[in-house]
């Protein structure tokens, strides 16, 4: 499933939203719930379900009919099939392949890669990393820095320190040395954005103590928690102030998948709504730049076989 708002001609601003684990059934289930909240039977369409163009995307892996987020993400990011678990390389686990984000950067656009889970998780990593195993979190973090994109956001790194390499600097130090400003939470981002050349937006240390693997589920959100809508708003703000030929921004709603793995319909629905809220930020931007903006919303795979 892919839903698209098209620019007239070549797009200057490209938004790529990925609902991890989000198939047609997650979207339809959410819309059915929203109608019920309104007191009626039927569906209440999400903003992106009303986009003028709809298509299909296949993300089966190079070796399996059932894909995973690494192979599926690589398919979406590069247009190539690979083995389950591999990121940014072909099925031979050797040949590196560049993502659309890397190509956008090489053509002079500002680039952002963002997620509601950790910045080194499979889907965001598909856009910048080249590893044979999605669990190589420290190396993925190093690839994030090496890619040199302008804006990254997520909960945190999963393995900022590599215990196998004694004396190796942690990823935060490496980020700062590479010119990144690290912001903790949306309020901190607002304080630091103007003077930053490149930005890494993470959740607060307080939130990390509860769960560093992701920002909270939308259904569990507390005041001042970082949200996917905050992340998207910050990314648009930051990339727009760069003196470049437009930008490319990937935004992942990563916990739709997690909720479906847990058979948690309530969290699935609320995180799908959270993704739609993030898309609304792009829609608002597109209204100001109607002839130059492309918005694409898709999923890397469906999770859980959700049925109604």
Sequence positions of predicted segments:
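Hydrophobic h-region of N-terminal signal peptides that target proteins for export
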Residues: 1-7
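N-terminal catalytic scaffold of extracellular/periplasmic and nuclease hydrolases
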Residues: 8-193, 197-198, 302-308
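Beta-strand elements within well-structured catalytic alpha/beta cores of enzymes
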Residues: 12-22, 104, 202, 246-254, ...
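Active-site His/acidic residue clusters
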Residues: 122-127, 206-222, 243-246, 250-279
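Phosphate/oxyanion-binding active-site loops and adjacent basic polyanion-contact surfaces
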Residues: 133, 224-232, 271-275
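Active-site regions of oxyanion-processing enzymes, predominantly non-cytosolic
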Residues: 185, 189-202, 231-254
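Surface-exposed beta-loop-beta
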Residues: 193-236, 260
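Metal-dependent active-site segment of extracytoplasmic phospho-/sulfohydrolases and closely related
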Residues: 276-308
